[in-house]
């Protein structure tokens, strides 16, 4: 009879499983399954709790929560009741499936519960009120055993409530479970998360029979909280206690030795790993990868990687990320391709890393292909992957696409905003960058030092002192002004807005100074033509044991060039190589060509170019071309122009410079030929623009502008300035007009240059109490405007500051800070 009943139960179970599978295969929801069962007679009449329990256990084994729910529906339809044992199995099925709401409802409806019920709910982290759950268990009088305490300790940690774990320590001690290894390991982990290393050590000492899990837990506690040396001592004690290291302890030993910088010890750990064959474990393997990549030994890292199993995405992702961080973007791309060929599916970390590599290498094509893959594998909604995609398009100068992706984000974090702001700022779109910064503030985005640095960079590119001061005030208010990156950006902003004295005061108030701080200050002095001060700052920097880098010397060389300090510049260049072991880059050579060209040493400059160990860039030849034109050396000018056009046949600046050279020599036929070539090649001359800020608004002026609302006042001021300047001895330099026209027309043309229009507006609208007028210009100031500004500064008795594409010109009482060399 018993055998017969079991056969019936098996048959009924199969019928229910088949029915549930059909429901699930058809794509119906759990609710649909319940309705389907309710709409028909029960398919398994007469089953008892034991049979139901067996069926539910089978659902758990097959990871089939839908069938478990269908069985539950059938039980409810029949009005049957499960015993406590079977109900706990059903509760376990819901918990493991992640059906938290159903699990909690079932738990609350249970007519009786035992500690297994509470532990089951706790183990699945389905309860968001762990204290209430524990109190209920205690209130209902259920047994408190090691399993209960361990489950609740893990629940507290999983819900980021580890700080209340000590609350359980007292009853654990009271019941004598503090010496239990199972409970002790959970307590050690909880105290580790809280940062209470001493309490964890006390628990460890109280455990009578310490197993490998307890030892691994206390060692990990010390490592995770930064006690690397003590953790290594504990590892030694563990070995002396007779426990052989395993994957977990090897991983911990690697973390500790790397944290201490004991790389030789870490390599010794690697030797032990090789002896015990643990290298194939992904966790240990990643620890070794971290060791060798941190040492910069990508070769040994790659050897370790090749010994690891290739079916785990973690090692692939780690190596791709490290290649990108070390500047090996091509190698990262090759590795990603190998990963795809091995049929390993990338995760969000992999995609973010390879996209960062594309952004660094400006690989637009690959970035677009990866964009398609991101959408295909469903990571386009991941915020980190989306931010990396935006960064790729921004760095590849495709801001329209970057902004479109940004707008489509369902949720944005501060990195999303920063990426777009930085993208605009790097492209010289200061206005758009600052607008985005304002939008971020309106959206109550948490502004970081990156946000402030980018916003200040935008103010610097706009030369907007007013906006920069506002950002500075906000940085002070949010306690960001003292951060090194923000302070460095403040130095740069004030210097580029013409106030080098305030830039120096920001530097003087810095609590922490890094090499970028010195570089920002040196660059500021150099841009203002104060080469001697730049040299003095370099000496102070070296006296304070701060090692200068390539950017430091680039700023100093630029300052020497702007100030005409030929000998000092050459000595600085030689010292950079001789004393500091810094190999010159193209920018250093460009500064030296400008320096030598300014002193008329064109032969020496040409020899320097010919001796460069790599191919000279457009910038170097352009510096040589400009110097040759200033010295009226047509031979070198022609050669420089030819070299530039070999590299870039559509280089607009070269056509303009050569055209200006012919115009200066009144070779109008050659000028016409150059302009015809520009038209045929589709090369357009960048229009000269000057701008000035007044009351928060920026006013732009181009040559001969006539549509400004204050044009009548501007023209009146220009006529007055022309009259006063002529009486003061100003003589127009008609060679500055590179057009074939009569002298009268040339004189008129000179007085409608963009910087003079901006100056006239400033004199009309800015009160005389404002002693300084700052004008920005996108091109080099012409010789006639330079002469006129010197005279006008004496007439109006105000400081006139013009920042052109190369440097600042401070006009005061008829003298310019550049010494008439620019």
From Swiss-Prot:
UniProt keyword Membrane, yes or no: no
Primary localization: mitochondrion
Transit peptide range per the UniProt entry: 1-70
The PPR repeat ranges on this chain: 48-82, 83-117, 145-179, 180-210, 211-245, 246-280, 281-311, 312-346, 347-381, 382-416, 417-447, 448-482, 483-513, 514-548, 549-584, 585-619
Region entry Type DYW motif, spans: 727-822
Protein name stated in the entry: Putative pentatricopeptide repeat-containing protein At5g13230, mitochondrial
Any single Gene Ontology cellular-component annotation: mitochondrion
Top-level taxonomy: Eukaryota, Viridiplantae, Streptophyta, Embryophyta, Tracheophyta
Gene this chain is encoded by: PCMP-H89
PANTHER family per record: DYW DOMAIN-CONTAINING PROTEIN, PENTATRICOPEPTIDE REPEAT-CONTAINING PROTEIN
